UniProtKB/Swiss-Prot annotation:
Keywords: Disulfide bond, Endonuclease, Hydrolase, Lyase, Nuclease, Secreted. It comes from the Eukaryota. The keyword Cytoplasm does not apply. Pfam families: Ribonuclease. InterPro entries: N1-like, Ribonuclease/ribotoxin, Ribonuclease_N1/T1. Belongs to the ribonuclease N1/T1 family. CDD domains: fungal_RNase. Its main location: secreted. GO terms for cellular component: extracellular region. Disulfide bonds join 2-10, 6-103. This is Guanyl-specific ribonuclease Ap1. Its EC number is 4.6.1.24. The active site is at 40, 58 (proton acceptor), 92 (proton donor).
Length: 104
């Protein structure tokens, strides 16, 4: 079930919800994992028009279906706010430099 498409990766709403839950759990505990210390603040330099406001945080969502645990984050991210509301999915796939584009 393809609720979101990031490049060639397909994600169901439940996979997105699971990833968001894992990321928010660490955020609310003040913890992070990996070299880039996820979840970390996402400043929305790209100017995406997210359906929720707030301070945004990015967390890797893995096409393998596994929960991110500190290894390679891949290209795809779940973005949530400090109230645990989903802002959307973004990806480095198809973006220039270190930028992001919205997932479909």
């Amino acid at each position: 079930d393809c609720d979101y498409t990031c490049g060639s990766h397909c994600y169901s709403a439940s996979a997105v919800s699971d990833a968001q839950s894992a990321g928010y759990q660490l955020y609310s505990a003040g913890q992070s994992v990996g070299r880039s210390r996820y979840p970390h603040q996402y400043r929305n330099y790209e100017g995406f028009n997210f359906p929720v406001s707030g301070n945004y945080y990015e967390w890797p969502i893995l096409s393998s279906g596994s929960t991110y645990n500190g290894g390679s984050p891949g290209a795809d991210r779940v973005v949530f706010n400090n109230n645990d509301e989903l802002a959307g999915l973004i990806t480095h796939t198809g973006a220039s430099g270190n930028g992001f584009v919205a997932c479909g």
